[in-house]
Amino acid sequence: MASRARSEPPLEHRFYGGAESHAGHSSLVLTLFVVMLMTCLEAAKLTVGFHAPWNISHPFSVQRLGAGLQIAVDKLNSEPVGPGNLSWEFTYTNATCNAKESLAAFIDQVQREHISVLIGPACPEAAEVIGLLASEWDIPLFDFVGQMTALEDHFWCDTCVTLVPPKQEIGTVLRESLQYLGWEYIGVFGGSSAGSSWGEVNELWKAVEDELQLHFTITARVRYSSGHSDLLQEGLRSMSSVARVIILICSSEDAKHILQAAEDLGLNSGEFVFLLLQQLEDSFWKEVLAEDKVTRFPKVYESVFLIAPSTYGGSAGDDDFRKQVYQRLRRPPFQSSISSEDQVSPYSAYLHDALLLYAQTVEEMMKAEKDFRDGRQLISTLRADQVTLQGITGPVLLDAQGKRHMDYSVYALQKSGNGSRFLPFLHYDSFQKVIRPWRDDLNASGPHGSHPEYKPDCGFHEDLCRTKPPTGAGMTASVTAVIPTVTLLVVASAAAITGLMLWRLRGKVQNHPGDTWWQIHYDSITLLPQHKPSHRGTPMSRCNVSNASTVKISADCGSFAKTHQDEELFYAPVGLYQGNHVALCYIGEEAEARIKKPTVLREVWLMCELKHENIVPFFGVCTEPPNICIVTQYCKKGSLKDVLRNSDHEMDWIFKLSFVYDIVNGMLFLHGSPLRSHGNLKPSNCLVDSHMQLKLAGFGLWEFKHGSTCRIYNQEATDHSELYWTAPELLRLRELPWSGTPQGDVYSFAILLRDLIHQQAHGPFEDLEAAPEEIISCIKDPRAPVPLRPSLLEDKGDERIVALVRACWAESPEQRPAFPSIKKTLREASPRGRVSILDSMMGKLEMYASHLEEVVEERTCQLVAEKRKVEKLLSTMLPSFVGEQLIAGKSVEPEHFESVTIFFSDIVGFTKLCSLSSPLQVVKLLNDLYSLFDHTIQTHDVYKVETIGDAYMVASGLPIRNGAQHADEIATMSLHLLSVTTNFQIGHMPEERLKLRIGLHTGPVVAGVVGITMPRYCLFGDTVNMASRMESSSLPLRIHVSQSTARALLVAGGYHLQKRGTISVKGKGEQTTFWLTGKDGFAVPLPEFTEEEAKVPEIL
């Protein structure tokens, strides 16, 4: 294989095919023949580029998964692909998760190795930049670990595909499963403990939360950063008081601890259920699945539902593949130090399938006589469903976006033979998007015949049950003795009490803002006399959303216009509520039943939470028939449609641009909120307040207003002129979602921006002599050679704005820019930045006010950047998990480590060197030397503890344990440091050479944070003292090793050790020690070792 960076063992492993040829004559014909033959042979060989980190502590280390690619290459070379009898090889580069180094390595692979495809990178730091360059160079890129989330849009990377299903997929499966099982209230519990290498919790948490929060009530969210059992129990205890259905988002190791904590808390009675999301981290659960005998496991496992791919758990073929990968990794060229099959990364299977999928695509294109070296054409072939593969990870089939979809199953612990196993009982079809029982004899009740209710019968706080009346023999006797008169009296009293209770309950509901503060008493609103309807309940006096085409009655509440006689025509009743002018949008009486639905209540709460200067404030809802209405802020200037209609002259561009900025800012906020989109953006839903600030309205509460989340397109009953702003892809749907889509909002914005540019109030197509239904029919016609759009004159606005409009109403939704890009274009088109309408009157003062928001945002970004700098600085002084706990104000408990290796070094003759140098020269010398050391140790799994003067202390095996790898890491690092020191030049003494002496020792230590002011992460124990003695008794330019470290290096293998003999060590007596002189395959120059220097000096 290609050469790799620094200390890794050489991977000289290439796979070639074809035959060698040579020229023995000088004739021109023979020379041309040889050139042609060599060209054909070169064409018959395909080189695969592979990027992954070497460091074994990384979850995607090549030492954990690289053999998966090697196995695939062997298969391809043993079973030739295509009519051209291709041969295959791969070249590996240690990406080190550094974007700059990875980019340089990729360029080198393309220019020197002539790679045909790149598999990787495995690090997100490098994925985006390499993906963009691969797309530019037309090189296929296969992402086998799901790190290309930034380039999932194939518009940016049209040569990229991803073998791992998107994380949103498992969120969709979870949503469908919860709906199928009838659970509505849930809690989310997850995180990553300090010792866990699982770093996907943030992305998976976001994907799950985005899917669930609009469909379910999330009663609690608990994030943890420590796996301590007491903290886990405390989190579970608080969550169990408000949730019975608990989603676990964590690694398998953490899940085991969480479930044990649940067992200790007694959450194993069957009233609680735990849904564990597992995409690949299956080592722990696979052990449970594979047991044939009765397994001893906590009772709480019976309440676990496992959501994982349908291929999950491993078939016999999967087990054989993992075993084969493990065996290959242990042998050259990888020579991995992993000690068991459990340490093999499950991503090795995706790596294997990535190459086979590429090879099969190459074969299909060769059969079709297409150029498989055309990366875009190759990816298009994949996305067109022309290539399928039955791989180790199951069926591999990509959609049109280059994303892979896998079927999922819901597993539960079920009886199997003499024991219990996790077996599937629900199956999710990723293409049909449906979930159904795994077998016909399983139903929604689950594998055990029943499942827990998502809440207690009386509620979590006993608030849904009345106190039961006392029972007993005495009461029975008294009841039987009651005479009819008393019975009548009791019934009358009961009726009176019930009426009183209902009256008080009604008052309670209205007076508790924590529960129903969005409910508004209709009597608390004072309707303005001139706008008060003649009688309540008449549709003509209301903003009736069910009849949006009625004269002067529209869905855009709070809008008015003036007639030519300056008579104000209000489009909705206006009133006073708590000192605010409010607009009332009346809803039909059938909405009374809808407000009780959980989905409607959830959306009401979302509307209450939306606070932005360009969003119409939502006050609440009146739920008292017949006056059911939505209450929002009243905007005095009406809608943008009214402003355009009533303007007697052409508005200034500053005037228009201010409105555009307000719309963009409002849409940016909405798209970032849980609502995700507006769905009805048009001039009549853009309201203008008394300060000439535009506010968006007309979104949300669709189910409450209309009784459904979709509207059915009806050719006869639809006012087609109201659809001019609706995107064509939505118009083609039979059921059009009220909420629309983000891309549809961009299209609506384009039409609206065009209305502003041309200042047209009667619709964007008023210059066309065609009926509205004909116009809509042309817009949604996908066969039209040129999509119908409104006229757009170039001289009406800035050319960049005109180009923006055309980009925003592109026929393909994927080609439309998002609102952040739109805002950036607006700033570029208006050099003065955002300018409000009143700027022309107030000059610089108003200009400052209009920029104030951007200044605050910039200062906030600077504050966040400075905060990140502080956090980054803290992370260089302390381990990351220690820094997080200190920032949170928590104490850090000391931790015991059973085995670590400690490195000490100092400079021989440093005191004399200091006497010959100025203090500034000494500081510069140490800074240059330690900067060199710091850069060198970055490639090793070590932790720099501290520096004191010329002493340098490093440890491996803490704060994150790495098994038996610590001695190997420290020894290799020591050889590197010794090598770079021999070439180090002292700035003010160029003729002098530093003489570094090093000591190593292996043993147990205790680590903890000491002090409050300038806290430090310190190590304690006899191991530290012994390592220091090894350094002080070492010789210049030598690595002195204790007997315990020597034993560890002999187990690791490949190191050159020379016995020094027995020496007297202060406080330890006679000790047998060794010199570390080299390592197999270590090509870096080291100082020569003489026997004279090995003589034992007098130890003080």
UniProtKB/Swiss-Prot annotation:
It is an enzyme of class 4 (lyase). The keyword Cytoplasm applies. Pfam families: ANF_receptor, Guanylate_cyc, PK_Tyr_Ser-Thr. Residues 901-1031 form the Guanylate cyclase domain. Its EC number is 4.6.1.2. N-glycosylated. GO terms for molecular function: ATP binding; GTP binding; guanylate cyclase activity; peptide receptor activity; protein kinase activity. One of its GO terms (cellular component) is plasma membrane. Residues 549-826 form the Protein kinase domain. Residues 44-481 are extracellular. GO terms for biological process: cGMP biosynthetic process; intracellular signal transduction; receptor guanylyl cyclase signaling pathway. It catalyses: GTP = 3',5'-cyclic GMP + diphosphate. InterPro entries: A/G_cyclase, A/G_cyclase_CS, ANF_lig-bd_rcpt, ANPR/GUC, Cyclic_nucleotide_synthase, Kinase-like_dom_sf, Nucleotide_cyclase, Peripla_BP_I. The keyword Lipoprotein does not apply. Keywords: Cell membrane, cGMP biosynthesis, Cytoplasm, Glycoprotein, GTP-binding, Lyase, Membrane, Nucleotide-binding, Receptor, Signal, Transmembrane, Transmembrane helix. Glycans are attached at residues 55, 85, 94, 418, 443. Expressed in lung, kidney and skeletal muscle. Low levels in intestine. Belongs to the adenylyl cyclase class-4/guanylyl cyclase family. Homooligomer. May interact with NPR1/GC-A. PANTHER family: GUANYLATE CYCLASE 2G (PTHR11920:SF500), GUANYLYL CYCLASE (PTHR11920). This is Guanylate cyclase 2G. The gene is Gucy2g.
